């Protein structure tokens, strides 16, 4: 599903995957922010899975979404509360900020870490938040006006990641934070989908 924001292109995809899965569900999420506030800050309504809390709402609503099978990639924003991130880490989440990707793992090393989403799971949900590009990738530096942070993921890195995910398989995926009128980002999403499909095809030919 390709959409502009949450919950229509995040929680709304995670929910049916969880409801239809016979076992545990892993998640691979690329993002600049954790989107894991305890409550939606725009409405203050605990029922809402909004842009800032859809991920925490997913894990609190569906017991088969497994935090030890969460692979969280790309965050480097300074808007997060440390207690929120530490809570996920203490519960077994696998976190790869862009600093770690660039200074230690590289894209090849990062792709190896995708295994955590698949270990012991029956399904995997993949979420591409395109604000991960802001500040370095092909998206405008002021992606959606305010979401850019330094050390963004490059177009090659996100395409390579999608290709490797395709080789491993997935149940469903979604895109959000697509800059309106950004033709290069639109094209990048087409590349992500195409290279992911190529990965699926390669896995089935082996």
Show where each model-derived region lies.
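Conserved alpha-helical scaffold segments that buttress catalytic/binding sites
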Residues: 1-206
């Amino acid at each position: 599903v390709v959409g502009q924001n949450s919950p229509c292109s995040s929680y709304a995809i995670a929910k049916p995957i969880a409801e239809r899965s016979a076992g545990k569900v892993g998640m691979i999420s690329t993002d600049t922010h954790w989107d894991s506030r305890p409550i939606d800050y725009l409405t203050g309504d605990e029922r809402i899975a909004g842009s800032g809390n859809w991920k925490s709402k997913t894990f609190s609503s569906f017991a088969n979404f497994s935090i030890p099978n969460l692979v969280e990639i790309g965050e480097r924003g300074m808007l997060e509360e440390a207690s929120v991130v530490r809570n996920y880490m203490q519960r077994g989440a696998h976190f790869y900020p862009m600093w770690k990707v660039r200074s230690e793992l590289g894209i090849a090393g990062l792709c190896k870490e995708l295994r955590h989403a698949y270990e012991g799971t029956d399904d995997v949900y993949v979420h591409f938040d395109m604000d991960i590009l802001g500040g370095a990738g092909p998206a405008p530096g002021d992606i959606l006006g305010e979401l850019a942070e330094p050390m963004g993921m490059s177009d090659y890195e996100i395409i390579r990641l999608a290709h490797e995910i395709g080789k491993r398989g997935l149940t469903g995926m979604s895109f959000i934070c697509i800059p309106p009128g950004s033709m290069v980002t639109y094209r990048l999403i087409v590349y992500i989908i195409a290279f992911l499909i190529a990965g699926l095809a390669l896995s089935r030919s082996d």
